[in-house]
Amino acid sequence: MQTTKERFIAALQDAETTTLANYQSSWSGLTEDQVEENRESYGENVLTKGQESSIWKRIVESIINPFTVILLLIALVSLVTNVWLAKPGEEDPTTSLIIVVLVLLSGGIRFVQELRSDKAASNLSRMIVNTATVIREGKEAEIPIDEIVVGDLIKLSAGDMIPADVVLLDSRDFFVQQSGLTGESDAVEKVCLKKATSQNLDSLLESESLAFMGTNVISGRATALVLVVGDETMMGAIEQTINTYDEPTSFEREMNTISWLLIRLMMVMVPIVFFINGLTDGDWLEAGVFALSVGVGLTPEMLPMIITASLAKGSIIMAKEKVVIKKLNAIQDLGAIDILCTDKTGTLTQDEIVLEYPLDIHGELDLSVLRRAYLNSYFQTGLKNLMDRAIISRTEREAKKHEIVRGLDQSFQKIDELPFDFERRRMSVIVKDEQGLVSMVTKGALEEMLAVSRYVEYKDEIIPLTDQVREEVLAEVAQLNEQGLRVLGVSYKSNLEEGYAFEVADEADMILTGYLAFLDPPKPSAAPAINILAEYGVATKILTGDNEKVTQAVCEKVGLDVDRILLGSDIDSLSDQELAQAVETTTVFAKLSPDQKARIILQLKANGHKVGYMGDGINDAPSMKVADVGISVDTAVDIAKETADVILLDKDLMVLEKGLVEGRKVYANMTKYIKMTVSSNFGNIFSLLFASIFLPFLPMAPIHLIVLNLVYDLSCIALPFDRVDKDFLKKPRIWEAKSITRFMAWFGPISSVFDILTFIILYFVIVPMITGYGYVHGADSAGLFIMLFQTGWFIESMWSQTMVIYMLRSPKLPFVQSRPAFAVMATTLLGALLVTFLPYGPLASLLKVAPLNALYFLLLAGVLFLYMASVTLVKHYYIGKYKEWL
């Protein structure tokens, strides 16, 4: 079988018939049997998204991370000291076994949760299908792109994403954007084999007749033969190269910052604890194990699982609300946006455009204008937009009553066309009638139509387009625009030569025959949706290619501020500094090109905003790519769906409100876990430092620290499902590592104060009361004294960490103004009770814990009450000082 490059070169050099025959194809396309044969021979049209990990590799990845490596290192050191170096008969592998079991337990939970999340993400991705038009057995069919095979004939037009590497057999004004492959920003014209003047065989990307998977059609049409599919395509080769490089999102970068913050803190605290304990007790091996345990105590081991569970839960909930999250992290990014930029059509309006009036230049109904508009819309081969469909629909209705617009598709023949592009903002078709008369009919934005017209037609009379006539036309159209009607101009010229290769330059000296007034009424839900988004701290900005009059009329109906409208021409005249100010004070931008839309979004981001962009057209793809969150709809063109992070199954701003809320819930519950866990653990470290200096023994055994940390983490497993206060959801939420550091510094030391109070109670009251004596270093009774002391702090630490969850999860008064979810209460209290009853159960001797008396628990209740009261006071001060909570 030929290599990919050999197939490309052969297709460029051989005759069309030979190339088709090489792949069992013809101008009628493949048969079903040939499809299966070619799929078997050349493979499926699916890109491998990196090498999929085996189940065993995924299990290992779930278990092994920097924190569990430390745990396993502690287990190994414990095994050496307590088994290999122990005296005969005193071997005790308990600590090592417990650590290994806890590592496997936490890793197993993470593995199961990530497996469920991956399955959910896979199910969501199946809801969005990109399709292509193929010719098989002489008939056109729309099929998913992964069903395309080598040898298929495919039809391509504006808005399509090219689904495989192809050679063009027929083309007309076919322009492709292939910056994703070449880095070249300008669209490139591709021509079919018979029109090509030269083919660059050394650099196939520059070949005139080859087009490649992943590039998108800007304008024109083509019929192409599929040469290469799947991983063998140019895009497939690049995918294989970059699969190991995954650019982190802003959310991932912040999470990495948080992880490194904890690691740096651990690297500072561990040596301090190690040296203090080593110098105090002289047992450097025990000091090393304890110091490593302190490191583990600082780390939220369940953080990856909490993040994954939170994002997956949010995505699944959004799927039920007709929102598909293509990338899990996008759900959190959606909650962070403070500006939503969107096109007007279909978002503010009903996306069901109706042709209200085909008018002559004086604003009178004229079906001859509709007749010419129909020829333009019907015969053009590009992407038929809503206005094209409205023209065709109106003509079909009028044809039942009026001869002038009847049977046009039969009485005219298409000769050529000049496809639409965003620079000209118009498109032309060249047609021939039954008498052989060749005409060009052009339709487009009125300003552009006036620019190419030299005459106007009124009641079959052709007169020059004078300045006075131009002003009359513009005044008439302005009145229509003020009513919210969108207007296109229609021009023509006749008596053209057949067989001539028409060019854009031929769109000149035309006759303006009239214009078309379209109604695209506002959605009833648009105004309430904009108000709701504003309540959630999200400003809506309109970025449209439509003219300012229509845009103003629609925006006023939905309650948007339109005191100032900035036009595309204004944007081009502004420096970056001037634009930085303009985008802050302007809500509506009109007559924009795709590049101008993207520039506005980039400037908003440079100003510090988190920006979402919602669109569904070819011209929206650049904006979606540069926005923090790209949002599209399932009916969008392929390139828009491919670029988007979020896809709405219902194009309605009201749906986005649910996405914002869910994104902020995800943020809230992840932040709760990180801030509460890190601050509690940070407080424990202060307590350990104090104890290491003033106590003649370790305040908690290494195994106690590890069990405490992991039981607490496991008890937080329900936090992704916690309730979130409505007030908290009203503002955009952005990850900031510095706020975690500040939170930790404020609330960590508070717990240390009450830990020290617990130390005093245990050392001077409770333990002497139970044992009948105080601590005597080296005495036989010292072991029981130490065990009781360590048990007391072990239990107090778990209860204080558990109770503070209820105090810190909300700025409001717990249980009165804000209640946690039942699942959160159940898991956290279960964890606290488990630790409390360990000294009374069969694991007591293994964990080296001992029962305490009733007085201890009575005093513990008092300590916890004082701790909760102190946290409440500091919380109110903190909120007043920093004007934020989580």
What role is predicted for each listed range?
Residues 64-84, 100-110, 129-130, 260-278, ...:
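Alpha-helical transmembrane segments of multi-pass membrane proteins
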Residues 1-140, 146-149, 154-162, 167-247, ...:
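Non-lumenal N-terminal regulatory segments of integral membrane proteins
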Residues 73-98, 261-299, 312-322, 498-501, ...:
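Helix-interface capping motifs at the ends of transmembrane segments in multi-pass membrane proteins
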